[in-house]
Amino acid sequence: MIILGIDPGLSLTGWGVVEAFSRDKVNPLQYGCIKTMPSVPLIQRLQTINTKLQSVIDKYKPEVASIEELFFFKATKSIAAVGQTRGAIILTASLNKIPLFEYNPKSVKTALTGYGSADKYQMQRIVKTFLRLKEIPKPDDAADALAIAVCHVNTINWNANNNNNASVFLKNKVFKESAKPNLLKKLFSL
């Protein structure tokens, strides 16, 4: 199953594509960031995100996408910008008939480390190790997008007899410790 993870941001939208064969066998296909300049009008920035994300979709043909949920910022302007960016991303996925799953930051951290308070560096190390990458993905938004894709892998009900026929389900947006593998303990101790 090919999964597109997205970390939405108006200036930098991170994306990561992984191919999952099982919970433990996940290969990174590619990752990167879509950058827009603050000096460009909002509509053009959203169009850039749409166009570049469409190119990623056309190239990798993801079966599902996962995106970070909007969480509350202190700055109202940031909330609006990320909300508008998410709208452009959700529309792009919808027009391509790609099911889109949303995860809050704490759920992503819990899925990868076993606890929801992991710091950014711990998350980046887990992504690097789990996906067998030579270095931590840069910029941070790309690493976050890969983490969101790997988080989605943990919500897949893998049929032991036929991994090609994996069915997807969403677990109440909060992962139960017993319902997922703890990648942090499995890979290394931090």
Curated annotation (Swiss-Prot):
It comes from the Bacteria. Homodimer which binds Holliday junction (HJ) DNA. The HJ becomes 2-fold symmetrical on binding to RuvC with unstacked arms; it has a different conformation from HJ DNA in complex with RuvA. In the full resolvosome a probable DNA-RuvA(4)-RuvB(12)-RuvC(2) complex forms which resolves the HJ. The keyword Repeat does not apply. It is an enzyme of class 3 (hydrolase). Belongs to the RuvC family. Coiled coil: none annotated. It comes from Endomicrobium trichonymphae. This is Crossover junction endodeoxyribonuclease RuvC.
